[in-house]
């Protein structure tokens, strides 16, 4: 077999020497200590460890909820640790979606309205909102609950609606 000369693809996520310190000079907690890894497109990753090992801190840094003390985090080659506040807001708005363990759906909105929320906030045209919400609802199998409120849905339905809300802007 001939050797492959295909160019390796860039990781979708890359962490390089990420450190996070909390506390004061006299009482420092090192939550992350030189974390480095890559995630390729289509790859599934589990972050595992005992309580207090830094899993949530790492996810908070990757998701831009928190900033690392040092090191770099790249999303599709873009160093998100170097973004200024305005750039970071734009990055969050256009590139990130969150699905929390508790679905965090707004109780006063239907599933359809919850899914459409980011598009509505960003003033997307009404036809685009309808098309995107319908498309993502079909892909995630939640078309039957679009007009229901969160208290009328099962836990699994809420999670799928939350996932739809997270990816509707893609």
Which residue stretches match the model-derived regions?
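ABC family nucleotide-binding domain
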Residues: 10-170
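Pre-NBD coupling/linker segments of ABC/ABC-like ATPases
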Residues: 1-9
């Amino acid at each position: 077999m001939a050797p492959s000369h295909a160019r390796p693809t860039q990781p979708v996520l890359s962490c390089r020497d990420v450190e996070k310190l909390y506390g004061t000079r006299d009482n420092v907690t090192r939550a992350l200590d030189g974390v480095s890894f890559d995630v390729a497109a289509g790859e599934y990753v589990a972050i595992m460890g005992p309580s207090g090992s830094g899993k949530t801190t790492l996810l908070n840094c990757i998701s831009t909820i928190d900033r690392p003390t040092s090191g770099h985090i790249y999303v599709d080659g873009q160093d998100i640790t170097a973004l200024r506040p305005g750039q970071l807001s734009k990055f969050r708005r256009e590139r990130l979606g969150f699905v929390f363990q508790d679905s965090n759906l707004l109780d006063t909105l239907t599933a359809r309205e919850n899914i459409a929320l980011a598009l509505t906030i960003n003033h997307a045209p009404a036809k685009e909102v309808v098309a995107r919400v319908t498309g993502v609802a079909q892909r995630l199998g939640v078309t039957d609950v679009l007009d229901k409120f969160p208290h009328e849905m099962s836990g699994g339905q809420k999670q799928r609606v939350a996932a739809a809300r997270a990816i509707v802007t893609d």
